[in-house]
C-alpha cells in the first residue's frame, strides 16, 4: 500500500540519521563491525515497516532513545542496537501464514527485547510481571501473537499515565484440554464492559481485531480471544490456543 511505502521511505531516512549518530559515538577500533551491524539493521527495519509488521511509532521512539543513549552510554546503546536488530530479524523471518508457528519461548524472547527497548523511553514507569509456566515454552503459536497485546497494553494502559504502570504476562497449560492459556494485562484505566467492542477497535492497531480474525482463520474457530475490563481495573486479554 502507498502509506506503507511512504512510511518505509521516512523510516529509512530516520534510521540512517540515527545510526550515523550512533556510529560516530563508537570507538575507532570497533567502527568496522558497528558499521556492518547498523547497515544490516537499517535494511531490515525498512523492510519491516513496508511489510506492515513493525509499528512506525515504536520504530521512531526506539530511534530517539538510541540517539539519546549514544551520547550518554555508547556501550548500552550497542547492546540496545543488538536487541533491536534481533527483533527485526525475528519479524522479517515470520510469514504470518495460516500454518506458520513458532515456539512460545521464541515469541517471549522477542517480547523481552521489545520491552527492553520500551524501557529506554519509559524507564521505571514500565514495570513487568512475568508468570510463565516453563512447560509451555515449547508450545507452538502463530508468530507475533503476544507482542501486539503487550504493545497495546503499554500504548493505552501505561504510557499515558504520569506514574506509568504494570504489565502482567502469563502462560499456563489448561489441564482439562491441554490447550495453551496466555494473558496480557495492564493496570490502566480500563473501561465499561459494554464498551469493550469500541475500546478494542481503538486499541487494535495491528493487535486485537487483527489477532482475533487471524485466530479464527488459523484454527477454524477453535482458538479463543477474550477481553476483560472494567473502569479503574485495567484491561486484560486472554488467549486460548489449541495444541
Question: Where on the chain are the PLM-derived regions?
Answer:
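Two-component histidine phosphotransfer core
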Residues: 2-226, 235-238
